[in-house]
C-alpha cells in the first residue's frame, strides 16, 4: 500500500486539507514600546482579544473540514521524540548570540523544563529577571544590563506562512530576512525531522535555512503543479529565487518554471502575498499600486536550459499569468477598488491577503469591506473573520497559515 504524502501543495486554491498555525501567546506580552521596531510591530496588541480572534479563525477553517495543527504542540512532540532537548537548545542559544557564562545560565535554566514548557519559553522569550541573580564577570554583561531579555520573544510566530513553504511534496525551510524572525524556521525544521507524522517520510528540502540569501514564505505562491511564482521583495532576495529555481529544476520532476516578480521594497508591501493572492482558477486579488497605469511590472521567467537557467524578462504581468495557467484571460480584482485612499487603507489592513480554502472560496478579514464586496461581486464565496487585534501584526489570513496539504486540482 502506497503511503500518503505528509506534504502536498500543487496549487494555491485546491481544497485545503491540513494547515499549520500558531496561536498567539505570551510572546506578544513581551513587546514593549522601545522594542516595537526591532520586533517588527507597529503597535502592542491586546492578547486576550487577539486569541479570541485567532480561535474564531481556526473554527472557521475547521467548519470547512480543514485539519488544523498547532506549531507549538507539534514542536513539543517533536522535541520529545528527538529525545535530545540539549542539542536543540544549544542551537537556539547559539542563534540568539548568547555567549560566555550567560549561555550556560540560559541552558541550565531551560533544561529544567519539560518539552512543552521549554518550547513555550523559547517562543515567548526569556527575561533576565527570570534567572536567579548571578555575578557578572564580563564587560558586555555589565554594559548590557538595561536590555531585558536573554532570549528575545518571537511575536511574529503566529504568521506561520513565512518560516517555511510547501512546494509539491517538498519544502523550503527559510532563512528569514530580519534577525527578529530568524529562529522561527528552527521549529519547522525540528518538526519535519523528528515529529512521527513526518520523520518516517523522505521530505525534500528545496531550500534550507543555512542558505546565504533570505527567502520567505509570504513571497512563495504555487500557481500550478509546474509553475511557482516568487516575489522579489523587502524580505526575499533575487539570488535566493535563482538558487531555489536551480534546486527545483534539478530535483523536482514536476516544476518547469519559476516566475520572479519584482515588488517595491516597503514595509506595507513586505511580501508578495500582501499585494497579490489567487482566489479561483483564473481570478486573483491585487493591490493596484504595484503596477503602473498600463498594468505593467517587472516579471522574469526562469526555465531550465542546457547551460543552467534561461531568464526571460517581461513586463506584461497579467498576460504572463494567463499563459502559465493556460487561460485566455485572468481577472485581477483590485484590493479596495479604484479609490486610491480606500485601496491603500485596505491593503495596509491585509485586504489582498486572502486565504483560499477551495477554488472560489476564501477567508478574509472582516474590516476590509470594500475588498470583500468586490470579491463577492466577482463570484467568490467569502468567509469573514474578526480582526481588530490580529491585523496589528501586519498580516492577514494567508500570513497566519502554512498549508501542508491541498487536494490536487482536476
UniProtKB/Swiss-Prot annotation:
Pfam families per UniProt: ADI
Q: Which pathway, metabolic or otherwise, does it act in?
A: Amino-acid degradation; L-arginine degradation via ADI pathway; carbamoyl phosphate from L-arginine: step 1/2
Q: What reaction(s) does this enzyme catalyze?
A: L-arginine + H2O = L-citrulline + NH4(+)
- Per the UniProt entry, the Enzyme Commission number(s) are 3.5.3.6
What keywords is this UniProt entry annotated with? Arginine metabolism, Cytoplasm, Hydrolase
Gene3D superfamilies attached to this UniProt entry? Arginine deiminase, L-arginine/glycine Amidinotransferase, Chain A
Report one GO cellular component. Answer: cytoplasm
Family affiliation: Belongs to the arginine deiminase family.
Hydrolase as a keyword of this entry, yes or no, is yes
The biological process GO terms on file are: arginine catabolic process to ornithine; arginine deiminase pathway
- Give the location in the cell: Cytoplasm
Its name, as the record gives it, is: Arginine deiminase
Active site, renumbered: 399 (amidino-cysteine intermediate)
Main EC class of this protein? hydrolase
InterPro entries noted in UniProt: Arg_deiminase
Tell me where it mainly resides.
cytoplasm
Which GO-annotated molecular functions does the record name? arginine deiminase activity
Amino acid at each position: 500500500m502506497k503511503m500518503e504524502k505528509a506534504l502536498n501543495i500543487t496549487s494555491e486554491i485546491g481544497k485545503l486539507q491540513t494547515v499549520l498555525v500558531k496561536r498567539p501567546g505570551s510572546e506578544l506580552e513581551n513587546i514593549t514600546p522601545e522594542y516595537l521596531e526591532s520586533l517588527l510591530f507597529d503597535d502592542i496588541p491586546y492578547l486576550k482579544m487577539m486569541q479570541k480572534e485567532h480561535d474564531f479563525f481556526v473554527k472557521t477553517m475547521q467548519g470547512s473540514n480543514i485539519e488544523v495543527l498547532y506549531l507549538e504542540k507539534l514542536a513539543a512532540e517533536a522535541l520529545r521524540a528527538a529525545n535530545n532537548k540539549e542539542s536543540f537548545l544549544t542551537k537556539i542559544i547559539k542563534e540568539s548570540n548568547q555567549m560566555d557564562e550567560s549561555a550556560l545560565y540560559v541552558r541550565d535554566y531551560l533544561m529544567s523544563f519539560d518539552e512543552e514548557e521549554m518550547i513555550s519559553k523559547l517562543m515567548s522569550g526569556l527575561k533576565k529577571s527570570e534567572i536567579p541573580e548571578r555575578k557578572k564577570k564580563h564587560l558586555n554583561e555589565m554594559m548590557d544590563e538595561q536590555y531585558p531579555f536573554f532570549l528575545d520573544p518571537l511575536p511574529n510566530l503566529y504568521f506561520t506562512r513565512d518560516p517555511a513553504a510547501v512546494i509539491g511534496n517538498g519544502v523550503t525551510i527559510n532563512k528569514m530576512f530580519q534577525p527578529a524572525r530568524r529562529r522561527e524556521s528552527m521549529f519547522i525544521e525540528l518538526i519535519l525531522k523528528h515529529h512521527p507524522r513526518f520523520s518516517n517520510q523522505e521530505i525534500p528540502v528545496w531550500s534550507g535555512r543555512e542558505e546565504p540569501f533570505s527567502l520567505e514564505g509570504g513571497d512563495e505562491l504555487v500557481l500550478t503543479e509546474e509553475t511557482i511564482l516568487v516575489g522579489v521583495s523587502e524580505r526575499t532576495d533575487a539570488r535566493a529565487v535563482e538558487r531555489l529555481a536551480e534546486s527545483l529544476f534539478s530535483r523536482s520532476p514536476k516544476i518547469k518554471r519559476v516566475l520572479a516578480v519584482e515588488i517595491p521594497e516597503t514595509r506595507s508591501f513586505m511580501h508578495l502575498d500582501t499585494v497579490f493572492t489567487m482566489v479561483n482558477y483564473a481570478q486573483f486579488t491585487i493591490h493596484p499600486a504595484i503596477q503602473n497605469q498600463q498594468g505593467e511590472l517587472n516579471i522574469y521567467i526562469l526555465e531550465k536550459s542546457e547551460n543552467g537557467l534561461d531568464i526571460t524578462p517581461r513586463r506584461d504581468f497579467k498576460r504572463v499569468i494567463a499563459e502559465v495557467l493556460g487561460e485566455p484571460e485572468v481577472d485581477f480584482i483590485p484590493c479596495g477598488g479604484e479609490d486610491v485612499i480606500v485601496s491603500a487603507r485596505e491593503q495596509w489592513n491585509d485586504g489582498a491577503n486572502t486565504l483560499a480554502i477551495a477554488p472560489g472560496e476564501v477567508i478574509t478579514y472582516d474590516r476590509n469591506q470594500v475588498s470583500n464586496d468586490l470579491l463577492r461581486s466577482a463570484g467568490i464565496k467569502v468567509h469573514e473573520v474578526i480582526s481588530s487585534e490580529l491585523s496589528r501584526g501586519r498580516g492577514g489570513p494567508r500570513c497566519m497559515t502554512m498549508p501542508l496539504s491541498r487536494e490536487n486540482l482536476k
